[in-house]
């Protein structure tokens, strides 16, 4: 009790002996330590502090520095002391330690967040790659299955073909018949004398004969197919040649018909042109007129023309043909029909009748082409009484024209427009 309440004599002696400066230094240091402890208790600390370790490290560094100071010169010692004091100041403060641990915690949390985000992105990429690769793998699997099916079908067809060939060979006549199973047994039989020279040679010969027979069967089968194909090709070629021949014959016929029609048109045009020239050069005589006055109401005028039977036109102009005989006869037997007979004046036609005959004989015409003239040859020949007869053909002809009037006009020279080719 005395120790706690009152001061002992030992403490009093210490106070007397010790200096006040040392006591003040100790007190200040003690106050600092107590302040640090209070602050540590009030603050929030997530993890345990390592003050003891830091203090031990600092003590160790101080000891090493002191040992080195003894060995080094004074200049180096002063610089080292300054560095050590700075390090001690930085590390000794409790705020620096807290900040250091807080930065570490923040960095760990942020790095964890980044790593999780990267992991999620990688998982999404992996899933997409798996989907794409899965589709590609499925497509490849489908293609491989199709190829395998096609190969299996081909193999089945080949096997069926070989079986059919073998059946044909077996059903062939006995000269070609051979025992396949016996030869196979001889090929694969295990006997002691198989490797003898005679048996070995016989086996080789049998194999050669079998291969020859199989080749013959194959060649016969393919030869039949080739013959059928060649026959079909020949039939197609014959049909094509027939069609070409028919087309050529039709073309030749159409061309010949066109040439004939063009030739006829040309001949007609040449004839009309030649007549125009000849009519222009010919000097007609209007004096050759024979007027008759007959008591009968009906009179006939017959113009008889005679020509040589020739198919070609003469090279010289037909001036000789102009001297054809034109005879006027009356139907009554009273009047003699002689070219030299003279008629009295009272029987001659009057001028009014002549003018009327002229208007009837030469109607007003429009210019027409040779083709239209030929088309309307018969109608216009009946209408125009002026041109009674004309023949430039190959044979003789006689034309007669009937008049209801009681006079006969004079025959005027015809023009090419009044010419009608009668066939």
Swiss-Prot record:
Cross-referenced CDD domains: IQCD
Subunit structure: Binds to multiple calmodulin (CaM) in the presence of Ca(2+) and CaM-like proteins.
Lineage top rank: taxon: Eukaryota
Subcellular location: Cytoplasm, Cytoskeleton; Cell membrane
A Gene Ontology molecular function term of the record: calmodulin binding
InterPro entries: DUF4005, IQ_motif_EF-hand-BS
Protein family according to the UniProt entry: Belongs to the IQD family.
Function: May be involved in cooperative interactions with calmodulins or calmodulin-like proteins. Recruits calmodulin proteins to microtubules, thus being a potential scaffold in cellular signaling and trafficking. Regulates cell shape and elongation in aerial organs (i.e. cotyledons, leaves, and hypocotyls) probably by regulating cortical microtubules (MT) arrays orientation. May associate with nucleic acids and regulate gene expression at the transcriptional or post-transcriptional level.
Pfam families named among the record's database cross-references: DUF4005, IQ
Gene name per UniProt: IQD16
Entry-linked SMART domains: IQ (SM00015)
Domain IQ, chain residue ranges per copy: 99-127, 128-150
Protein name: Protein IQ-DOMAIN 16
Coiled coil stretches, renumbered: 231-251
Disruption phenotype: No visible phenotype.
Cellular component terms (Gene Ontology): cytoplasm; cytoskeleton; plasma membrane
Bilayer-spanning residue ranges: none
Keyword Ion transport (UniProt): no
Keywords of the record: Calmodulin-binding, Cell membrane, Coiled coil, Cytoplasm, Cytoskeleton, Membrane, Repeat
PROSITE patterns associated with the record: IQ
Region (Calmodulin-binding): 235-252
